[in-house]
Amino acid sequence: MHITVLVFNGVTSREVVLPLTVICDAVNPTVRWVALQPGPVHGFEPLQRFEAEAGIDTVEPTDLLLVPGGLGSVRMMENPEVVSWVAATAAEARFVMSVSTGSLLLAAAGLLADRDASGHWLASGVLEAAGAHPTEEPVTWQGNVVTTAGAAAAADVAAELPRRIEYGAPG
């Protein structure tokens, strides 16, 4: 199982760590860390840091594209290079999952156009302005795209994703 994680300065660390921990309890995935450019990325929380091995100039097929949220989400959704990378990588992914305000990036990439989507309640206006229909549901599936309201909901989804990816089990 291959997972691609988009990280950026201001990412909420638990939105990365919690779903990945749940997935790693079930399978031993290969995780590819991607950021604007390779190198260190600082999470929102003090002392939390991720090391991106690749920049957004490369797109590779993946089983799961994980797009977490955080204070840097709006800045990322306003970056056309990031939005293009999300759209291109999502097109190559078997599944796409956003956590909290990560849904803003999916909406900006056109993945949530005229679709229901979960996300952080404080960002529902921005999500709607980007063309999605915000819901109050903690999890919203739209085909192979799943949006979650936060880390706890993402952990619930992460518990079933390995089964869906590895065995093609229906949802």
Predicted regions and their residues:
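A conserved active-site-flanking secondary-structure segment within enzyme catalytic domains
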Residues: L112-V139
